[in-house]
Swiss-Prot record:
Homodimer. It is found in: Cytoplasm. This is Uroporphyrinogen decarboxylase. NCBIfam families: hemE. Keywords: Cytoplasm, Decarboxylase, Lyase, Porphyrin biosynthesis. Substrate binds at R27, Q28, A29, G30, R31, D77, Y154, T209, H327. Pathway: Porphyrin-containing compound metabolism; protoporphyrin-IX biosynthesis; coproporphyrinogen-III from 5-aminolevulinate: step 4/4. Catalyzes the decarboxylation of four acetate groups of uroporphyrinogen-III to yield coproporphyrinogen-III. GO terms for biological process: protoporphyrinogen IX biosynthetic process from glutamate. It catalyses: uroporphyrinogen III + 4 H(+) = coproporphyrinogen III + 4 CO2.
Length: 354
């Protein structure tokens, strides 16, 4: 494979020296970019875009043409695994993702296959290989998956949810069925991420978007336990280089110590966690990624710069920080504000690296 020209993102995840703090944005390939909207229209719909390696590659690269980002992230969706399990994924206008055949009981769980990543999910691996080829070693490529708990919420609720009553009913009334589902998902995610690594992903991230809706005890049992199993099963080296793993639980700021015990290399933070506090608590064990409120990108560039400066000062001197938003970029953010954000991170962070 081509030698990496810019590896500061990988170095920061391993708490190694860098010249400036690396930066990328969750959902950096997305609807805030007019060129993304044009490519998506060309694809016809969202899943057709995900399943076409050339177009998925095109949208992955679009933000890198605009901004000097330090990493590319595979353009895909967290629901590829449940889709490959045969749940009938579709997107309802204004409603988000839905499943025609949600999981309602242990009998449904028993019938679910564990997808072969090079077969049912081969389109994702094709996209990874295509993106790596087209990146020409400019920056590393991040692969990702949803966490078992987060995937299970969609599969059991039948789509997005606000209160999570359906999955919580299963969790409290039939925990055995839910554990069986989570175990199957943990095996599937491990295979899926390892296949992405073999196809060329240089770092992987597990998105636990809905872990924060759980009590501390339930988080440990139903979310973190299964992410830990995945981390234990991942390929940690490929192409002669360490493959860093980042865990991100939205709303998980109170559980950072337990998350850092999983053996991951980095933790993602949302904007409700104070980064200085997070570094005091776990900075000796893991790198930290985050954590500007994505809504800050609606502010004028001077205010964005002020927020970047505050977060950099909060993390302080030294290594182990990847700058990011605390969750995905909103679809109506002005693209030039995203540009001001990226530029400010690089310009203002050099003083923190000797």
């Amino acid at each position: 494979m081509t030698e990496l020209k810019n590896d500061r993102y990988l170095r920061a995840l391993l708490r190694q020296p860098v010249d400036v703090t690396p930066v990328w944005m969750m959902r950096q390939a997305g609807r805030y970019l007019p060129e993304y909207k044009a490519t998506r229209a060309q694809a016809g719909d969202f899943m057709s875009l995900c399943k076409n390696a050339e177009l998925a590659c095109e949208v992955t690269l679009q933000p890198l043409r605009r901004y000097p980002l330090d990493a590319a992230i595979l353009f895909s969706d967290i629901l590829t695994i449940p889709d490959a399990m045969g749940l009938g994924l579709y997107f309802e206008a204004g409603e988000g993702p839905r499943f025609t055949a949600p999981v309602t009981c242990k009998g449904d769980v028993d019938k679910l296959p564990i997808p072969d990543p090079e077969d049912e999910l081969g389109y994702v691996m094709n996209a990874v290989r295509t993106i790596r080829r087209e990146l020409k070693g400019e920056v590393p490529l991040i692969g990702f998956s949803g966490s078992p708990w987060t995937l299970a919420t969609y599969m059991v609720e039948g789509g997005s949810s606000k209160a999570f009553t359906v999955i919580k009913k299963m969790m409290y009334a039939d925990p055995q069925a839910l554990h069986l589902l989570l175990d199957k998902l943990a095996k599937s995610v491990t295979l899926y991420l390892n296949a992405q690594i073999k196809a060329g992903a240089q770092s992987v991230m597990i998105f636990d978007t809905w872990g924060g809706v759980l009590t501390g005890r339930d988080y440990q049992q139903f979310s973190l336990y299964y992410m830990h199993k995945i981390v234990d099963g991942l390929l940690r080296e490929n192409d002669g280089r360490r493959v860093p793993v980042t865990l991100f639980t939205k709303g998980g700021g109170q559980w950072l110590e337990a998350m850092a015990e999983t053996g991951c290399d980095a933790l993602g933070l949302d904007w409700t966690t104070d980064i200085a506090d997070a570094r005091r608590r776990v900075g000796h064990k893991v790198a930290l990624q985050g954590n500007m409120d994505p809504s800050m990108l609606y502010a004028p560039p001077a205010r964005i710069e002020d927020e970047v400066a505050t977060i950099l000062a909060g993390f302080g001197q030294g290594e182990g920080h990847v700058f990011n938003l605390g969750h995905g970029i909103h679809q109506d953010v002005p693209p030039e504000h995203a540009g001001a954000f990226v530029e400010a991170v690089h310009r203002l962070s050099a003083q923190y690296h000797n």
